[in-house]
Amino acid sequence: IVDNAKILDVPIVVFESSIYDIVAEDEKSPCYLCARMRRGHLYAKAKELGCNKIALGHHFDDVIETIVMGMLYGAQIQTMMPKLHSTNFEGMELIRPLYLVREEDIIHWAKYNELNFIRCACRLTDNCSISETGDKGSMRAEVKKLIRELAAKNPYIEKNIFRSVENVSLDTVIAYKKNGVKHSFLESYD
């Protein structure tokens, strides 16, 4: 990461945290906890440095995988937002500048610029790491593979998944949550 930043002439601050020690004790969902804690540490460090935003590298493929994962594994319809205000760090905002960029375009750009990116090096992911073919154990890898298989039959699959959360008709939804409050279609049913 430091080498990539130097190549691109981008200033970078690297700092230590104790996230791994805490996450290692969570056998059920260490990746989720790690992601939440990393984000919290990024917010705190950014605020300490006088910044008002953190930028995450989620891209288009991450977004559609998250939509499908939410439906299949979380029984919910939701997405990653391209930007949002932090609920725990007042005055801070999260942005995802690569939101509309395809993963393969990022990979090609990185190779063209001779940049190297690390995959998660956490030993807790040994049994669920994402391979290039998406064959190994993680939910995200499974969903990535499913989307790839569906896209082989229908070239609009990725765009349709992405647009599905832009075209939600609340009149045809059994229930939805707004600001943490669940609403049922029965509330307005005559």
Predicted features along the sequence, with ranges:
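A short glycine-/small-residue-rich loop at the edge of a beta-strand within enzyme catalytic domains
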Residues: 33, 55, 97, 101, ...
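Residues that form or immediately flank small-molecule/cofactor binding pockets and catalytic motifs
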Residues: 17-19, 99, 122, 166
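Catalytic subdomain that performs nucleotidyl-dependent activation
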Residues: 61-142, 146-147
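Short, basic, helix/turn surface patches
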Residues: 36-49, 83-89, 143-164
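The feature marks non-catalytic terminal segments
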Residues: 115-190
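ATP-dependent adenylation/nucleotidyltransferase module used to activate substrates
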Residues: 1-77, 81, 104-112
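Charge-rich, low-complexity amphipathic helices
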Residues: 23-28, 64, 68, 76-77, ...
